[in-house]
Amino acid sequence: ESEAVIRGGIPLCAPWFGHGPNNDQDPQHGLARRTDFEVTVADPFRVVGVAETASIGIRHEVVMTNTALEMTLTLTNHDQKPRVVEGMWHTYLRVADAAQARVRGVRGASWHNFATGDKGSFDANELAVAPDTDTVIQGVGPALALLDSAWGRQIHVETTGCPSAVVWNPRSSSTHADNPTAQAWRDFVCVETGACKDNAVIVAPHSDLTMSTR
């Protein structure tokens, strides 16, 4: 359904994230995840899809290796004027208990928690997944790790060209009991990577922006 919220997997947010850097775009998280892609390569371990939306060309490549899922996103401005674009992978990661989870690799980055309105910068290198976590991180390094303490494991995220990250979990101090996503908060953490908000990118006409994550 075109208006359905996607809860799981790796939804692709482009050419804007949320409602855009100026909070004036609809639908939320862009058109890419509501657009049909043409598959141009379909090998057993590599898929490439292309689409065109709002004068922005989208190319998304997914490669599966023995140790990682590698994704590369290219956004091309087909307009005659510069365009501000954002691109994020809204990755859902399964954990044993989100209340015990932490994200490592944030020291020195700035943060803005959109659930609480708080802002600051990280002195420590870890962010705990507490209630009301909807935290946009800017100036983040190329290596993050989700520490899944209850299962004794780490999920590593490595990026290229991705200055932004978002850590989100629907656990809330005012959760409504009839919200199925909120009820499932313990089972997952979203560690999203790409370029968004303060790090949205101005792409010149007939130029492109490429980023990757694994």
Predicted regions: what they are:
Residues E1-D26:
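Acidic-aromatic substrate-binding/catalytic surfaces of carbohydrate-active enzymes
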Residues D24-N66:
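Extended, loop-rich substrate-binding clefts of extracytoplasmic carbohydrate-active enzymes
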Residues A14, V41, M64, L75, ...:
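Hydrophobic side chains in beta-strands
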